[in-house]
Amino acid sequence: MLQTGIVYRVADLVIEAGALILAELRRPGGPRGSGYKAEVDLEIEVVLRRGLEQILSCDFVGEETGRHQTGHRYCWVVDPNDGTADFLAGRSGSAVSVGLLDEGEPVLGVVYAPGTPRGSDCIAWQQGMNALFRNGRVIAPSKQNRDLKGSVVFVSSAAASKRAENDILCAPATCEPIPSIAYRLARVAAGDGAAGVSLYPVSPHDIVAGHALLKAVGGDIFDQDGKPIRYTVSAEFIYPVEQCFGGQVEACRTLLTRQWLTLLKLEPGA
């Protein structure tokens, strides 16, 4: 069993590392980097890796610093700055994502978005907890957002230029663009919406933390074929994931019936 309370130490570490995102956004001339790589991403992951090894020394898979795998039952899975392309364009809403797998099962997740229009937001959970905690407070996710009707579906920032088309696909919910898939999933787990969607391939480091949070509230993540997404003991997907739909099961099942491929001809990224 995972040691009680380590999620609080992880959250403190993630918030500390997330301060680098804000500092980078405020640099004269904007963030350093191009395309899908920001220089600060590596700096953040180095801080996270060092701190996580002190909290629980085990295997590690990071987007920037690579893999350290020995066959340990636990494995940290880290994305230091999910939503880098939007971050480099000066848009807020990227997130630090730290998940922990126990023999391929998500058992801890911390997602921290330091610079959203709503302010900083940290959502976390670990196995054995009865509820999520958000910004230091225990929360009971709202049941009213578990269905699509009257709720929102979190989609990529590319949807901002095609709101009407996305709203049709999300109906009877409406769409809300967010750069980070990790943060989309975390907000769904916290009760802010019914589902989070990515129409482009994701990696385990993008979604393990959010998957843990969804698991805590009875949700799940499905691939483009409607199969529940699962991981190997080496922190890889069992099947290739081209798209993902995360949230309450019935909401995801409904969204999976929609013609999302039509958007790929309209949007540069999702």
Question: Could you say what each language-model-derived stretch is?
Answer:
Residues 17, 21, 52, 84, ...:
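Residue-level signal for inorganic ion chemistry
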Residues 99-186, 192, 237-270:
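Acidic beta-strand-loop-alpha-helix segment within the catalytic core
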